């Protein structure tokens, strides 16, 4: 590979090739705005039931409240994660993960790499797990989670999830303190930076998230997505995959309402419960259909 080993595009390629060697199928990102790679349907449905799975994929993520109008050097409302899920977990999974860092030229000898206990919970999906954050020289770069529950169902067997924070890893690899200065890709004609691609988007999306999104319209969207998700679950032959997409859309709308400070702290819990109730119903129906 003649171009820069460290650029963002190559980082993705290296991880995809490495996890392919670990017998993971490489999936494509979900084409919906979601807050984390965990929301991908491969992870949600793949963790339910006894069937083994080994999968990896990149996922673009959106967290409207994290927008900073393109002015903050390391905080974004849109960013990338690389997700790995393996069920049942491999006994030496931490060592396998550390080898992936070595391929990125991040060695334990030259860096302070720590596994810091950090149990994880996602109330919206009725999911939680035990695990660790991985810190690289004091900065979190990865979340390790052993799922105990998803959709309110006990995970049997447990699934291990590894979530790489790609921007943070790339900033270390390229020795950059500003995410917008990262080299995304390059050839003999041109270097393309992260800022070239995403900084204007951060500015505009932040304006939309905090100032211009129509609150009344967002409330209407939320109710319609919830209504449609319920309807699809209650069909004689439920459309569970489609219903799941509707609750993901409702979840994103909820996050936009949160960014607009349109929901009080007491109301907030009610909105989360509406989504979680449907996520649990989808999980139960999916497990039942798999048993049949």
Swiss-Prot record:
It comes from the Bacteria. It catalyses: tRNA(Gly) + glycine + ATP = glycyl-tRNA(Gly) + AMP + diphosphate. The keyword ATP-binding applies. Its main location: cytoplasm. One of its GO terms (biological process) is glycyl-tRNA aminoacylation. GO terms for cellular component: cytosol. InterPro entries: aa-tRNA-synth_II/BPL/LPL (IPR045864), Gly-tRNA-synth_heterodimer (IPR006194), Gly-tRNA_ligase_asu (IPR002310). PROSITE patterns: AA_TRNA_LIGASE_II_GLYAB. It is found in: Cytoplasm. Keywords: Aminoacyl-tRNA synthetase, ATP-binding, Cytoplasm, Ligase, Nucleotide-binding, Protein biosynthesis. Its EC number is 6.1.1.14. GO terms for molecular function: ATP binding; glycine-tRNA ligase activity. HAMAP family: Gly_tRNA_synth_alpha (MF_00254). Tetramer of two alpha and two beta subunits. NCBIfam families: glyQ (TIGR00388), PRK09348.1 (NF006827). Belongs to the class-II aminoacyl-tRNA synthetase family. This is Glycine--tRNA ligase alpha subunit.
